Amino acid sequence: MESADAFADRLKTARSASQNILIFARTESLIAGENVRDALSRAEKYISAGADGIVIHSAETDGKNIFLFAEMFKDMHPDVPLVFIPTMYNSFDCDTLHQHGADIIIYANQLTRSAYKAMLAAANSILGNGCSKYADENYCESVGNILKITDGDRNDRY
């Protein structure tokens, strides 16, 4: 994990390049096995360096350290947006996460992971049936609908 000072220097450089962007700095402390105090220290440095918001992430499933971080962070910076990424602590609903201090919630990889499972199911269907008809009917969006959302003028062919 990069030192907090080195990362803060990069944030200062980004901030000096433009005031017309929002910078959200992610602290990896809890992912890297550090404690809440380290995460708070890093967040403080990142805000001082020009970050507009803080992203906090954790590999723990109970949410305990995320919620403790959020409570302490919001006491110090009530107006700074705080972003949660509940990949591992996925049993908490949005209302609960907001009550614990999240201003923004990012479901970072759930759609990619679910797409992978759907691709495996489609591939197995094609291999098992020797054709794609069943996969098309059960696992695939129609070509027409895909074209409609990606290139509206060509959807009349399907």
Predicted region positions:
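Alpha/beta enzyme core
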Residues: 1-87, 91-106, 114-120, 124, ...
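Extended, intrinsically disordered, low-complexity segments
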Residues: 110-158
